[in-house]
Swiss-Prot record:
Enzyme class at the top of the EC tree: hydrolase
Binding residues for substrate: 19-28, 105, 132-133, 199, 237, 346
Protein name listed in UniProt: N-succinylarginine dihydrolase
Lyase is among the record's keywords: no
Gene: astB
Family of the protein in this entry: Belongs to the succinylarginine dihydrolase family.
Amino acid sequence: MPLVEINFDGLVGPSHNYAGLSLGNLASASNAGEVSYPRAAALQGLGKMRHNLALGLTQGLFAPLPRPNPVFLGALGLNAIDEVDQAQRRLRAAAWSASSMWTANAATVSPAPDTPDGRCHLTAANLVTMPHRSQEWPDTVRQLRLAFADAAHFAVHDAVPACFGDEGAANHMRMCKSHDAPGIEIFVYGTTGGAFPARQHEQASRAVARLHGLAPERCLFVEQAPEAIAAGAFHNDVVAVANERVLFTHEQAFANPEATYAAIRERLPEAEIVVVPSSVVSLADAIRSYLFNAQLLTLPSGEMGLVIPVEAWETPSVRGWLEAHLASNGPIRRVLPVDVRQSMANGGGPACLRLRVVADPATVDPRFLLDEARVAIVEEVVRRHWPEQIDPADLGSDILAQTVHGARGALLAALELSELA
């Protein structure tokens, strides 16, 4: 079978909560302390996966990581249920975080057509800027090495050293004539100095490119606009997304946009760059609606579709631009709203929830691939075992810890993934 793009969505974990742990993530901050609905959140995510399967796309799934994380707590001299003070409460909340559902941060992926050994390379992201995410990568690597165990087709690398912050595919884009053709890889980094941290370090991006053996002339290292980070674009995928020959971006996404566009066109002459001007959609509206945190996909018909959160369609300026684009000869021919409101309330849209891997599905462990029957199996597990709701004040409850642990165990049993238990 030829190489195709597979979107591996992270299933929203049973400990999904709104503890407000993510500095620079406006949605996370604004919903801190609210009651979350893990069961509804997971079902919404599965609804998006089913939606994309119905489009004729190849869909994968990653399981939630173990939470509350005893390794993380033990390293801090804490446990999951003891009484703690206010400062320690945030550390404990980090150990309960379900943030691994945003698999765009799981790894950076370079497919076989771009690499010298003809294998797909994946480097786990260290996510060191945020404590609640910094604990993820060892368990993420375990899952990646299971899903992509075929060493003839995949190479999975450990995270780069923690002194260089790496946020994975959320700050990486690939452009190409087609998914199975050689492409260019665009690494987007930030610079420090603003009110919010620049999570992606340039040296982390360059290290990943070296680990993957990418040809320097096929790589671009581009600075994210400081004003975008300051406005709440904590990852580049909040203000830009690419698919095959198309870059879809806000006017204020990059520090030097014209130089960025010129460098892309020099390396990929057929590139089509769709820029949304700030005079039509403000940076604030783009970030609030998550217009660009969308899945830009090549459909089986060959046309491109944009899977957006319903919040984007409900934002007048965004809807106006999308309707005008659909009426034009632009490359995006379908706009497909989906409901992932529970994830959105924590700062994660459709693009955050998936990791794109270009590969032959036959080379992937089939336990990580979905069809309608497997979606139904996972939905049944979620309905039976995921908590209906969690108040952040509940974090630390022994009963809740047992419920969360049991829910994940039931999922792994249903998917026959006992290696991850």
